[in-house]
């Protein structure tokens, strides 16, 4: 059973990665209306080879991969619930994975049938990364990563725990601003990075405000991550799981900043934009794992005593 769970969890992560990619691809290519206003089929029927368009194919493939991924997520949640029922995080994570998967699908359906509001659709990506993070956490528990890094003896102080919780919430909000940039079509509102023509110019449109706000949010996120990394290396250097996680988070945020800048300089190159979406998804999952470790800190302290 354990071997099956390991293989299935990896396959589920791969499937959900494809879904995240697919959703970003739909947005980047403007394929959201590729299947008309019917759901789950395209214009009420399966796609026929005689009337295939790139937009229709992208949208239909996204719907199909979402459906396949739903099966993987539900099976993983049920099996983890049964096999790891003694782990206190298992049931909440399984519920979150399935619940947010359903919410994600319903939001996608609503956008197709009743139209797309950019502020609501920006939440669609946020919902998907919560589902993704919960699946990654289940997989890490299945692979017993805690034992390999001796995370069961990890004890965090209040200051670090609060920073990790707050940073994760803030990262989610920063992700929302990035999704809003896409859905408000503000990617090229300020065509030079970090400011317009190298100088700060007062925004004059909604798109300008959205773009500037996202860049400010990203800058704060980078500074905050650097601060938390400094805290970890100052006070918790002996815990490999923390030092490794923070170094990895800095790698992710550096790649995120680079792909963000390149997205502007390349006129939103499709592959760079997709990488930009995937990197922040992985960073958020990593921060959620740190939240999981932080939530265990008190019980670890009592157990060690």
Curated annotation (Swiss-Prot):
Pathway per the UniProt entry: Porphyrin-containing compound metabolism; heme A biosynthesis; heme A from heme O: step 1/1
Disulfide-bonded cysteines: 35-42
Enzyme class: oxidoreductase
Cofactor(s) of this protein: heme b
GO cellular component, one term: plasma membrane
Record: active site: 59
Its membrane topology: Multi-pass membrane protein
Residues engaged in binding heme b: 214, 276
UniProt-annotated binding residues for heme o: 62, 124
Family named by the database record: Belongs to the COX15/CtaA family. Type 1 subfamily.
UniProt remark on domains: The N-half (TM1-TM4) and C-half (TM5-TM8) domains are connected by an intracellular loop. Each domain is formed from four-helix bundles and they align in a pseudo twofold symmetry manner. The N-half domain is the substrate-heme O binding domain and the C-half domain is the cofactor heme B binding domain. The cysteines of disulfide bond Cys-35 and Cys-42 may be involved in transfer of reducing equivalents from quinol in the membrane to the active site of the enzyme.
Function: Catalyzes the conversion of heme O to heme A by two successive hydroxylations of the methyl group at C8. The first hydroxylation forms heme I, the second hydroxylation results in an unstable dihydroxymethyl group, which spontaneously dehydrates, resulting in the formyl group of heme A.
Name assigned to this protein: Heme A synthase
Upper lineage: Bacteria, Bacillati, Bacillota, Bacilli, Bacillales
